[in-house]
Amino acid sequence: MVREEVAGSTQTLQWKCVESRVDSKRLYYGRFILSPLRKGQADTVGIALRRALLGEIEGTCITRAKFGSVPHEYSTIAGIEESVQEILLNLKEIVLRSNLYGVRDASICVKGPRYITAQDIILPPSVEIVDTAQPIANLTEPIDFCIDLQIKRDRGYQTELRKNYQDGSYPIDAVSMPVRNLNYSIFSCGNGNEKHEILFLEIWTNGSLTPKEALYEASRNLIDLFLPFLHAEEEGTSFEENKNRFTPPLFTFQKRLTNLKKNKKGIPLNCIFIDQLELTSRTYNCLKRANIHTLLDLLSKTEEDLLRIDSFRMEDRKHIWDTLEKHLPIDLLKNKLSF
């Protein structure tokens, strides 16, 4: 983290992407600014985003490989240049992009002699390879070579104890960290009581998502951490008991919606997030699992789409309708609501 003094000031809080580039298929770079911030706020935001970007962003990777009758991971296979351990290390480096949840199966089945690359992996429909040229192994003889793989979406660094599995499968230390590196710096501007801070944030990703997408997901994760405080009343604590301990947010959904109604261009539904709709924790979590993050996402769904969501009930549908009816103009509901 670097702190410098610079001249200049801004009047309204805003963020902006000032630089974005693709260095390679597996290296994306983005540079962002957020300003103006009061003294100390830039450090608070920078530290929180750094932790969220490096530890809370989900990634997809190969977590297990099954070779068949291989005694241990240091074995060599006739007709293959690499050892089993080297193949496992190569599989660990494969960068995948997906929105899957849970474990999925994949496989490789080829005939030599030839080079095996990531392009040879047979994947489920929900998964794609970022760089198909990543090497896996070199078959030097005309042999049939097959591997069964497991793919999982997770976060952080996952390790498993090394042991010989009777079915010939071996765990791969999963690195589910799309953000490869991150740096933030703070610049001070203004004089006297008008002094503000500007936060610069640099993000490098592995290509499975862009720096802008990573920043969005990290921000959403941080918001999710504080949602239980906003839904304290639902957990059995009355508002009367909490009103002296809890200050409602300055910019509530209703106030923001009122401002948006004044916009002649109409309500930007993609700027209203579902956590602003005062939904119950249960309904909110159901929508989040279905990748419904904004009001635009919600209003584009039919009743059938919502009922197909795992654990979604008719009571949730009624709760959503009552909430939207409470906050949105009735003509907007008639025009936009699909259910």
Swiss-Prot record:
It comes from the Eukaryota. It is an enzyme of class 2 (transferase). GO terms for biological process: DNA-templated transcription. Its main location: plastid. Disulfide bonds: none annotated. Gene3D superfamilies: 5' to 3' exonuclease, C-terminal subdomain (1.10.150.20), DNA-directed RNA polymerase, insert domain (2.170.120.12), RNA polymerase, RBP11-like subunit (3.30.1360.10). Residues 1-233 are annotated as: Alpha N-terminal domain (alpha-NTD). Its EC number is 2.7.7.6. It catalyses: RNA(n) + a ribonucleoside 5'-triphosphate = RNA(n+1) + diphosphate. Keywords: Chloroplast, DNA-directed RNA polymerase, Nucleotidyltransferase, Plastid, Transcription, Transferase. Belongs to the RNA polymerase alpha chain family. In plastids the minimal PEP RNA polymerase catalytic core is composed of four subunits: alpha, beta, beta', and beta''. When a (nuclear-encoded) sigma factor is associated with the core the holoenzyme is formed, which can initiate transcription. This is DNA-directed RNA polymerase subunit alpha. The lineage of its organism: Eukaryota, Viridiplantae, Streptophyta, Embryophyta, Tracheophyta.
